[in-house]
Design a protein with these regions (language model features):
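P-loop NTP-binding site
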Residues: 1-99
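Basic/aromatic-rich interaction segments and small domains that mediate binding to polyanionic partners
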Residues: 100-151
Length: 152
């Protein structure tokens, strides 16, 4: 458990890797999470290698002023508790490097110039408007140089 919100894209990557490496030892897991940029609670559960998670309309959304937290429970055998805890903590939403209006290069198969339109949009660190004829919008799933870079 930790206070604050997480980056759901980091969680998805971590869970995929965890299940690939240790899925046979994980019997069940479940949790309720605060995802940065979303008002709904993210509820998930899994059995062995089967993972299911979604933003829930059945559970009340985070109320204004409510302390946001992330809770995760694993049941299994021979689990590395410290590695599980660290992996979960590594999914915490990071402080972002860019602000609305900043010019960046966004990776859309190749790095292309764009402008940050919104921070923490639909659970993604950035929504970027690509500076081309279409002015298409893309989400940046993780704030690192693999996905988005400074123009400077």
């Amino acid at each position: 458990k930790f206070n604050g919100s997480l980056n759901v894209n980091k969680l998805d990557h971590w869970i995929s890797q965890l299940l690939r490496d240790s899925g046979e030892n994980i019997f069940r897991y479940k949790g309720v999470l605060s995802v940065k940029g979303m008002d709904e609670k993210f509820v998930f559960q899994g059995v062995h290698m089967l993972f299911s998670g979604a933003f829930s309309e059945d559970i009340a959304p985070w109320r204004k002023g409510e302390k946001r937290e992330c809770r995760f429970v694993f049941i299994g055998k021979d689990l590395d508790h410290k590695a599980l805890e660290q992996g979960f903590l590594d999914c915490k939403a990071e402080d972002l490097r860019f602000n609305v209006g900043d010019k960046v290069y966004a990776n859309i198969g190749e790095f292309t110039e764009g402008i940050i339109l919104k921070c923490w949009d639909q659970g993604n660190p950035y929504r970027v408007e690509i500076q081309n004829d279409e002015k298409s919008n893309v989400w940046v799933p993780i704030d690192n140089d693999d996905y988005v870079r400074s123009v400077a």
